Amino acid sequence: MIRISVDVMGGDYDPEVAIAGAAIVQKYLSNIYFLFYGIEEVVKPVLKKYPCLDSISRFFPTESYTRMDEKPSQALRNGRGKSSMWYAIEAVKNGEADACVSAGNTGALMAMSYFCLKMLAEAERPGIAGIWPTLRSESIVLDIGATIGASASQLVDLAVMGAGMFRALYHTEKPSVGLLNVGVEEAKGLYEIKKAGMILREVQLEGLEYKGFVEGNDIGKGTVDVVVTEGFSGNIALKTAEGTARQIAEILNSAMRSSFLTSLGYFLSRRAFRTLKNKMDPDRVNGGVLLGLNGVVIKSHGSANANGFASAIRVGYEMVNNGLLKKITADLRRFHENKETLFDQEDEAAMSGESL
């Protein structure tokens, strides 16, 4: 039985969405159990609508919940030992749950998770990994906003963790990995990116196949399974892609309804447009994973619908079911055992210069 703790107060439309998402998941995952955390007078009436969850869940009332506008430090100070988010995370720490899912404030979720669960001994810093729809299938992109800036060693950590997540979700023995850069040539990019590329080429880590540098336009193509970058550029890439998807949808909707002929064309092509809409639907690939922590924590989009929240729960389930933490820990340990040797062998002349 895989136990999922759920902060049912975090999202824009919670607790309805979180509980409805759990009800969807239980239809196709038989060995799952939920621990719901939230304000009793708000959550109990919603739970009554879903009797299918009665035998596979337990509700725990909390004093408060974390608001979307709270700063991480404020949320941690106010929510520790009180909020639904804190208790959902603490359940993982105490071994009462195997994974935590929340649609709440990202900064607060990261701060509470970091404070409560601590880091894996082998990881230098956390990262948020997101599932990205591509022309080929799906890719994983990380870090998409946990921290700003990263050293070469930290970028390699992200590569190892991202590859582990891809293996857990898609059962690919050796996912392909690329470092996001301003060009594919080895001489281009910042020092830390070039240094990380050198390490990944030399170390030949088990469980991933390093393909070199990739550019921004390679993300949507699905050129590699895992795209690695630091949180600043990763978050910009994510927000740009989301904005572009909305822009395309609005332009198409306006164009297809501009005249009788275009409306007729839309009617005749509606199946193709439905396929396009489903492919670009963020709820289909909802569920960012907070990697590097000593526990599995999943971040759902705050605006996700029930199907989207169900997707986030499924991601958490797969992470646990496939032993993500043990595999990542072993992979990181192998890298760090050889790290000093690799750094000593670094060719400073070849790696010099930080200009584009």
From Swiss-Prot:
Pathway of action: Lipid metabolism; phospholipid metabolism
Signal peptide: none
InterPro entries, sorted: FA_synthesis, Phospholipid_synth_PlsX-like
Annotated EC: 2.3.1.274
Location within or outside the cell: Cytoplasm
Pfam families reported for this sequence: FA_synthesis (PF02504)
UniProt catalytic activity: a fatty acyl-[ACP] + phosphate = an acyl phosphate + holo-[ACP]
GO cellular component: cytoplasm
BP GO terms, sorted: fatty acid biosynthetic process; phospholipid biosynthetic process
Molecular function terms, GO-annotated: phosphate:acyl-[acyl carrier protein] acyltransferase activity
Chief location of this protein within or outside the cell: cytoplasm
Listed PANTHER family: FATTY ACID/PHOSPHOLIPID SYNTHESIS PROTEIN PLSX, PHOSPHATE ACYLTRANSFERASE
Subunit structure: Homodimer. Probably interacts with PlsY.
Protein family (similarity comment): Belongs to the PlsX family.
NCBIfam families: plsX (TIGR00182)
Protein name per its UniProtKB record: Phosphate acyltransferase
Species of origin: Bartonella tribocorum (strain CIP 105476 / IBS 506)
Gene: plsX
